[in-house]
């Protein structure tokens, strides 16, 4: 994509017909217990050394037993913890999966993202979404039913305030006249619509720099990617936009074990994992980040096996 021709983090992660790998925080097999959040700096540094290209964090406020996520994202605030981890690394990119624009004022998001991009140039990836956790919406006094409309308005505000000097913004979210956001990002921050964000596919084919969608089987994912890319071509002829997805992984000690489905992913040995990742690559997935939450083995042990045996097949670009 021409607008990212000289963007360091983007070009390590994304290229047409290529697949790179990332990791989901926490790098821990906590399953349905609260994670300890131990050794995350050490594990992220190890992931960087092995050639993983991205680290992804979630935007969650409250523990909600009805939602089934004891980690509440990664327990710590997404932006603060991202800053902490990024300060301990050198080149791996950090992404939000995803910043809930319906719950965060876009001016605050712009200030945070621009600051992060100045502190860690060309290493920030901005996933944005409308959100889905009712407890967070209720606690903030925000309507869950109108989150799609709020998302669109916040997205438009964010684009204006981040990339225009002294913009004129008239919005229900606020007005900007004769004022300017400082700092500005060092370059455009790659911005990915996450899920459908309560929009139709035409909207996020037109807007954003790529699409991040939930993990699904290759057959189902291929259909969605194909439909989306046809629409992208209609709105932006000859422009490449990357497709991103997470995948839960329970890596077997037996390298020859065949895949069996688990929640949001697969249990498999490494040989079949390489085959599976190549299938995802063939259908147009450009970056896949692995969540080790549901694994049976210690996460550091799994990370070593992935780094030594799987990453060489899907290196940084």
Enumerate the predicted regions with their spans.
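An alpha-helical appendage that flanks or caps ligand/catalytic pockets
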Residues: 1-17, 145-181, 214-317
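Conserved, mostly hydrophobic/aromatic
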Residues: 47, 51, 59, 85, ...
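Active-site mouth loops of central-metabolism enzymes
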Residues: 25-38, 99-107, 187-196, 258-271
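Hydrophobic faces of well-ordered beta-strands that scaffold small-molecule active sites
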Residues: 21-25, 55-57, 94-96, 124-128, ...
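A structural motif
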Residues: 52, 121, 208-209, 285
């Amino acid at each position: 994509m021409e607008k990212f021709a000289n963007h360091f983090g983007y070009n390590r992660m994304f290229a047409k017909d290529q697949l790179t790998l990332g990791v989901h925080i926490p790098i821990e097999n906590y399953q349905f217990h609260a994670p300890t959040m131990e050794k995350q700096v050490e594990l992220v540094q190890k992931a960087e050394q092995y050639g993983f290209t991205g680290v992804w964090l979630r935007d969650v406020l409250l523990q909600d037993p009805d939602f089934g996520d004891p980690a509440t994202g990664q327990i710590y605030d997404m932006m603060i913890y991202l800053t902490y981890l990024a300060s301990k690394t050198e080149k791996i990119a950090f992404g939000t999966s995803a910043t809930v624009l319906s719950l965060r004022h876009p001016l605050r998001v712009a200030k945070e993202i621009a600051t992060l991009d100045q502190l860690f140039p060309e290493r920030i990836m901005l996933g944005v979404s409308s959100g889905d956790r009712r407890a967070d919406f209720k606690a903030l006094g925000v309507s869950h039913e109108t989150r799609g409309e709020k998302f669109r308005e916040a997205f438009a505000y964010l684009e204006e305030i981040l990339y225009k000097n002294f913009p004129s913004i008239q919005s229900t979210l606020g007005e900007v006249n004769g004022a300017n956001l400082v700092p500005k990002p060092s370059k455009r921050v790659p911005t990915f619509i996450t899920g459908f964000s309560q929009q139709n596919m035409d909207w996020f084919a037109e807007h954003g720099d790529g699409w991040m969608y939930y993990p699904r089987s290759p057959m189902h994912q291929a259909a969605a990617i194909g439909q989306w890319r046809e629409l992208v071509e209609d709105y932006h002829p000859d422009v490449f936009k990357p497709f991103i997805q997470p995948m839960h992984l329970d890596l077997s000690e037996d390298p020859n074990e065949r895949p069996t489905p688990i929640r949001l992913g697969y249990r498999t040995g490494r040989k079949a994992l390489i085959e599976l990742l190549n299938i995802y690559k063939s259908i147009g997935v450009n970056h896949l980040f692995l969540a080790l939450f549901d694994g049976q083995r210690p996460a550091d042990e799994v990370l070593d096996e992935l780094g030594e045996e799987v990453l060489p097949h899907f290196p940084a670009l």
